[in-house]
């Protein structure tokens, strides 16, 4: 079986789990083995399973070569617990798999997981705020937005069409947007952009949009320092000072401005262990349980580098500010430690980069329901984060500028000319909303019939075409759209009105004969009756 990239979408973790099982069952060699004077057909050693699965994961573009052998052993333990494999005596259900010579086999039953039935998020379409009717009690403070300035030359070009003939005009001021209005615009446009980047028809299966806090998005976009790190209004939610000092010490090693210089061997390892213990005891990962499916879906875009970075930029913008700040500081420290050649090794057996991924993956990404591929998925995401953290953890400039321009457009003063309708000259932005299936079918029927009825009326009242052509066109229309035709011409009498019969009276025979001159050698008709 040829492994393929599992793209973004709902149930991506379950799809990956099933794909790995299928690849493992198809690629694992089965042979005859002997154990304690007995022969067993179609089985394999534990060490052989580790070798095979490790190679499959390393060559699979959904996981990559950074998967370690220990992670492979942990996954095989999950396989044994979930009855993907069993020992030669048919035992399973425990995670007692070891990288040794014990014999295992595949059970005859299907080990694939069914796709979970997630509760519907209501498929509620995000509504843009009605800024004409602000709610009482909302703050009038507005977020700083980019002002659009026009010099005199630009203004002249825009308004120079027959300047001498421009009628009287007046300025129409839009009501100022409230803080809540602008926050809802940020939320709506951010989620719309995320949906487009992920290539999904709907975000309902990967995120509950009701759980997205519009205030968090705005705070993450504007409350940042010179380094792009989020600043918190509530300092009690920040990292403790001693953890910040420890992180700065390792990130800037050997320059430790906040701590005294180490006085004993292994000092840096103790500092690192302190940081690991602090982040390990958190009740919720930094990417939060609510957004687990979103980030797992983004993993399907890693082959498309630019799209993956933009999707992660937007997804990280949805985080609570305190989680985003901790993530920024932690990933920046991890990246600096990985590339710091002056820092002594923090482990005897594991490379520093691998150690960073193993130590902090779980506190960055994991699911609430303890899924079986959590560790591998988190390791893949954290590795990508470390390599591109400066771009991913910055505010997406294109999204920010487009939202700011939209807000300015809504707030901009409009010019209304005499006799003109302001809304017709400067149409306000219109937005879509979801409708029911019955309403859609009704709109599809009526919406297509109106232009057809107009076309039929045009044919019927057109005096420039001949009667023959008109009848031909009407007959073709009746054949193609009988329902529309029946509405306009319910009876033959209504159709006959278009073609009044002309009286065809023959001229008197005498007058006809007299009009022609008498010609010799031709018989003329007798005038006698």
UniProtKB/Swiss-Prot annotation:
Q: Matching PROSITE patterns, A to Z?
A: RHOGAP
Key words of the record = GTPase activation
The protein's site described by Arginine finger is found at 231
What GO molecular functions are on record for this protein?
GTPase activator activity
Task: Provide the GO biological process annotations.
Answer: intracellular signal transduction; positive regulation of Wnt signaling pathway
Q: Which residues form the DEP domain?
A: 24-108
Q: Which residues form the Rho-GAP domain?
A: 192-393
Which superkingdom heads the taxonomic lineage of this protein's source?
Eukaryota
Q: Which InterPro entries match?
A: DEP_dom, Rho_GTPase_activation_prot, RhoGAP_dom, WH-like_DNA-bd_sf, WH_DNA-bd_sf
Report the SMART domains cross-referenced here.
DEP
Q: Does the keyword Transmembrane apply?
A: no
Question: PANTHER family under this entry?
Answer: DEP DOMAIN-CONTAINING (PTHR16206), DEP DOMAIN-CONTAINING PROTEIN 1B (PTHR16206:SF11)
- Its name, as the record gives it, is DEP domain-containing protein 1B
What organism is listed for this UniProt entry? Gallus gallus (Chicken)
**Name of the gene encoding the protein in the UniProt record:** DEPDC1B
């Amino acid at each position: 079986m040829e492994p393929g990239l599992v793209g973004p979408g709902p149930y991506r973790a379950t799809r990956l789990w099933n794909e790995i099982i299928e690849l493992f069952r198809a690629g694992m060699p089965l042979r005859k083995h002997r154990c304690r004077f007995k022969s067993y057909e179609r089985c394999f050693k534990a060490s052989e399973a580790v070798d095979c699965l490790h190679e499959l994961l390393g060559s699979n573009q959904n996981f990559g070569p950074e998967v370690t052998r220990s992670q492979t052993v942990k996954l095989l333990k999950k396989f044994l617990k979930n009855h993907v494999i069993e020992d030669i005596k048919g035992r399973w259900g425990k995670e007692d798999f070891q990288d040794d010579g014990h014999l295992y086999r595949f059970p005859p039953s299907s080990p694939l997981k069914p796709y979970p039935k997630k509760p519907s998020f209501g498929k509620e379409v995000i509504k843009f705020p009605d800024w004409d009717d602000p709610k009482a009690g909302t703050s009038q403070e507005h977020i700083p937005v980019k002002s659009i300035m026009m010099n005199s030359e630009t203004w002249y070009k825009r308004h120079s069409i027959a300047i001498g003939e421009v009628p009287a005009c007046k300025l129409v001021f839009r009501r100022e947007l409230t803080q809540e209005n602008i926050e809802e615009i940020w939320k709506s446009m951010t989620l719309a952009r995320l949906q487009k980047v992920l290539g999904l028809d709907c975000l309902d299966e990967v995120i509950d949009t009701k759980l997205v806090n519009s205030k968090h998005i705005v705070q993450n976009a504007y409350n940042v320092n010179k380094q792009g790190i989020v600043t918190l209004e509530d300092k009690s939610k920040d990292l403790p000072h001693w953890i910040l000092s420890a992180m700065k010490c390792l990130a800037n090693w050997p320059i430790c401005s906040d701590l005294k210089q180490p006085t004993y061997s292994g000092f840096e390892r103790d500092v690192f262990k302190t940081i690991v213990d602090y982040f390990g005891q958190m009740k919720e990962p930094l990417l939060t349980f609510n957004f687990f499916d979103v980030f797992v879906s983004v993993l399907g875009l890693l082959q498309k580098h630019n799209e993956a970075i933009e999707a992660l930029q937007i997804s990280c913008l949805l985080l609570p500010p305190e989680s985003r700040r901790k993530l920024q500081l932690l990933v920046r420290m991890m990246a600096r430690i990985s590339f710091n050649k002056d820092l002594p090794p923090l482990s005897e057996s594991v490379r520093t980069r691998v150690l960073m991924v193993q130590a902090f993956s779980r506190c960055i990404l994991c699911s609430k329901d303890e899924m079986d591929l959590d560790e591998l998925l988190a390791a893949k995401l954290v590795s990508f984060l470390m390599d591109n953290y400066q771009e991913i953890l910055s505010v997406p400039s294109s999204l920010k500028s487009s939202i700011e321009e939209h807000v300015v457009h809504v707030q901009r003063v409009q010019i209304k000319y005499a006799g003109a309708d302001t809304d017709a000259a400067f149409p306000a932005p219109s937005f879509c909303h979801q409708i029911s299936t019955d309403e859609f079918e009704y709109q599809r029927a009526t919406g297509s019939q109106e232009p057809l009825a107009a076309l039929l009326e045009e044919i019927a009242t057109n005096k420039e075409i001949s009667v023959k052509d008109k009848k031909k066109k009407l007959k073709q229309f009746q054949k193609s759209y009988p329902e529309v035709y029946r509405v306009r011409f319910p009876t033959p009498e209504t159709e006959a009105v278009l073609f009044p019969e002309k009286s065809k009276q023959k001229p008197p025979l005498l007058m006809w004969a007299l009009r022609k001159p008498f010609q010799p050698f031709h018989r003329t008709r007798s005038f006698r009756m």
